[in-house]
A protein has these predicted regions:
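Catalytic loop of the DD-peptidase/beta-lactamase superfamily, centered on the K-T-G motif
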Residues: 18-78, 203-208, 212-216, 220, ...
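N-terminal signal peptide c-region/cleavage motif recognized by signal peptidases
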Residues: 12-17
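Surface-exposed patches in mature extracellular/periplasmic domains of secreted proteins
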Residues: 59-67, 157, 228-230, 290, ...
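Secretory-pathway/luminal and periplasmic proteins that interact with or process carbohydrate-rich
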Residues: 75-77, 132-140, 150-156, 211, ...
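Active-site-proximal loop and beta-strand segments within enzyme catalytic domains
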Residues: 30, 45, 56-58, 70, ...
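Sec-dependent signal peptide recognition
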Residues: 2-8
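Pan-zinc metallopeptidase signature
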Residues: 414-532
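Zinc-dependent metallopeptidase catalytic helix centered on the HExxH motif
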Residues: 377-420
Length: 532
């Protein structure tokens, strides 16, 4: 079937939402009412064309589902076949293995219990799960949520244990005998088995099985009608058959049982369900705004280096957008849930072919560009040599981290990090971008720039860039910020410096004349030198 795409189904559906701005403690966990509307027809056509273009580029998908939620607008598309041998089409009702997106469900469940005072984030996990044997170091709930607990993962030192069903006690026993790979807090070690420990904590505290707890407190309130633990014995005719690629051809996936990964990778859901989960997080219907912010804040190792992972979600800046996401990869499936909390967007994707992470990410990034990035001329840097390249990379990182964190903190649940004074931060960033210093040791200068967003550097690039974004939004309005992902970092800096001139910003918020001269040379634009 390579090169030939199968029949598709495109559906515009209503969405679920809850009254904005109401904290969790002021309302019960209930399913959101049906409201909202489809995207305008021209946007639906554009979304469909974008997905089709990726399918033409990557014809290995058998079935694919894509869902998009932006504020009060919703779109779901389903393409290809959920079961090639039987000729069954993929639909919005099709259920897919969620794989590691299950970790996001588990993190929500844990934080619900934290909000109720039934679990403490910084408690030793053994206070909740005494069946976990004592190790060389204690491991906290917080560290497990952020993959900082040093717990090994299946497959690293032993088999995956996926040949037959096990209960939660059996799943916990799979990892109990292994020593920690690292002292907790010192090293990021992605671990499905760490999330099994959290699943055991949910069961111990709630008195319910993990699956029962999710149904009552996560799936139900989010309107996830078809979500469940992925027990092969309870699958219905709507579940997608899985495939893998062998010598460029699709063949059926290896049959595995995922009960041994229950809280780290053992669920299934439809694309509507996954999109509903994303919407419930954006609306703070599952956990409070504060807890949502914790989930979306990247943790750091003890020496102050970011892991780019919060509690149940990875985070990163993308062209000035603050991305919160989790992917899933298992036999039978490739999945991705991507949230932009500062812009009220959720994107959900699922394929029943393994190894499609890059394809799903291309679709998601294309949707972001389509929906959120105003088209405009991009200011390209006219640069020469290594020093110019390092300066330009620094400008891009100030812009990317700063705009992303500003959007997340100003329009989402985030809190800007860092404790130092802003004038000092601007002075330090100016020194990092100093041509003379870069020319003396370009490799060392670039290395310092690449670390300057980290906690051990007091989040310098984040704090300076976020202040610039806030200044621009106050002076030019929020719509102006939407232009920068397309127009680029030079436009961001040029506009900021122009605003600073008009407002007579005090030094050192103007950077210095050397950097301003670089910007003039990079863009050819006439930026007036500082009057100070």
């Amino acid at each position: 079937m390579k090169g030939l795409w199968l029949p598709f189904l495109l559906v515009g559906l209503t969405t679920w939402a809850a009254p904005p701005g109401v904290p969790l403690c002021e309302r019960p966990h209930v399913a959101a009412p049906a409201v909202e509307r489809p995207f305008p027809e021209e946007v639906q056509r554009a979304l469909d064309a974008l997905v089709r273009a990726e399918l033409a580029r990557e014809p290995n998908h058998a079935g694919l589902a894509v869902g998009v939620l932006r504020g009060g607008e919703r779109w779901v598309g389903a393409y290809g076949q959920r079961d090639v041998a039987r000729g069954l089409p993929a639909t919005p009702r099709t259920t897919w293995r969620m794989a590691s997106i299950t970790k996001s469900f588990t993190a929500v469940a844990v934080l619900q219990l934290v909000e109720q005072g039934r679990i403490e984030l910084d408690a030793d996990i053994r206070t909740v799960v005494p069946a976990w044997p004592e190790k060389r170091w204690p491991v906290t709930v917080r560290q497990l949520l952020g993959h900082l607990g040093g717990v090994t993962n299946y497959g690293r030192f032993g088999p995956s244990h996926d040949s037959g069903p096990v209960d939660s006690a059996g799943a916990l026993a799979l990892v109990a005998g292994y020593e920690l790979e690292a002292e907790p807090g010192t090293r990021f070690l992605y671990s499905t088995w760490a999330y099994n420990l959290l699943g055991a904590a949910i069961e111990a505290v709630s008195g319910q099985s993990y699956g029962e707890y999710l149904q009552e407190h996560v799936f139900g309130p989010a309107g996830m009608e078809h979500a469940a633990l992925d027990d092969r014995r309870t699958r219905d005719e709507h579940h997608a058959a899985g495939y893998r690629l062998r010598d460029g051809q699709r063949v059926p996936s290896k049959v595995i049982d995922v009960s041994g990964r229950f809280a780290g990778g053992g669920t299934r859901a439809s694309i509507e369900d996954l999109l509903g989960f994303g919407g419930a997080l954006l609306d703070y219907r599952l956990v409070s705004r504060t807890s949502t912010g914790w989930m979306q804040t990247p943790m750091s190792t003890r020496d102050g280096r970011l892991t780019d992972y919060g509690m149940g979600f990875a985070t990163w800046p993308l062209r000035g957008h603050y991305v919160v996401a989790h992917s899933g990869a298992q036999p039978e499936t490739s999945t991705l849930l991507l949230l932009l909390p500062g812009e009220d967007v959720a994107i959900a994707l699922a394929s029943n072919v393994e190894g499609q992470a890059a394809s799903l990410k291309r679709i998601a990034y294309g949707i972001i560009e389509l929906l959120l990035e105003d088209k405009g001329p991009r200011l390209s840097a006219h640069r020469q040599g290594t020093v110019d390249a390092v300066v330009n990379e620094g400008l891009n990182r100030v812009f990317g981290y700063g705009l992303a964190y500003h959007q997340w903190a100003a329009h989402g649940p985030g809190t800007l990090p860092g404790t130092g004074g802003l004038p000092e931060a601007f002075e330090q960033v100016t020194r990092l971008l100093d041509r003379a210093a870069i020319e003396r040791a370009p490799d060392a200068a670039r290395e310092r720039l690449l670390a300057a967003h980290e906690p051990h550097e007091d989040w310098l690039l984040v704090r300076v860039g976020a202040h610039m974004a806030r200044t621009l939004e106050e002076a030019m309005g929020p719509e102006r910020l939407r232009s920068y992902p397309a127009r680029g970092p030079l436009a961001f800096f040029n506009d900021y410096l122009a605003v600073c001139e008009s407002k007579s910003c005090p030094d050192p918020f103007r950077f210095n004349e050397t950097l301003r001269a670089d910007l003039r040379r990079f863009t050819g634009e006439n930026i007036e030198p500082s009057r100070h």
